[in-house]
Amino acid sequence: PLMPDYLQQIFIDSFSKDAMTGTLQRKTDRDWIDVLVRLRSELCRCPHCGKETFVRTDKAVRCIECRKIIKPQGRLEIGRMSLPVLAGVKLYKCHTSSEGNTEIENAQIFTGEIVPSKTTAGVLGIKNLTTGQWKEIKPDGTKKDGKSFRIEPGLKVEFGKPPIPGHITSTSNLPVGKIVPLD
């Protein structure tokens, strides 16, 4: 199947015989919005072929075009949402704003992106595309306001005002070691 299992499941739960006869509780608009925002958050470009595909934060997946395995370098967890750490992943207002997670329109407003370093292969960063400042909190507790941050295990980011906390959870292939600035 091309679509992620959680999208298939909400369709089954919503349109099954049990759901249609009322023996199963109906899925709410909020349930659908949560699934569609997750779907949008996991839509990425394959690092192998460049085509759009769905990337999970909890497991490696195959690109729906080239069939090569894609494993994100980690997860960016923001509230109840989890985004794959992969170049090109977009952050939306529904992720980074306190007013953002109740309206479906806010899943269309870009606020940031995971980008590759211009100078160091394999190093990724979070780029702030808003006019406001985001705060980086390094694993050693050092805090800094800025527009871009190098992704590393244990990195925390406060998005916007009031701050929405986010943090990086690493997977086994997240680059570690020497800290290289994101240019």
Each model region followed by its residue ranges:
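Short, charged beta-strand/loop "edge" motif centered at a coil->beta-strand transition
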Residues: 86-118
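Disulfide-bonded cysteine-rich modules in secreted/extracellular proteins
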Residues: 42-52, 76-80
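Short metal-coordination and nucleic-acid-contact micro-motifs, chiefly zinc-binding Cys/His arrays
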Residues: 39-43, 56-62
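Asparagine-centered strand-capping/turn motif at beta-strand->loop junctions
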Residues: 126-130
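C-terminal boundary/linker segments immediately following FHA domains
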Residues: 135-183
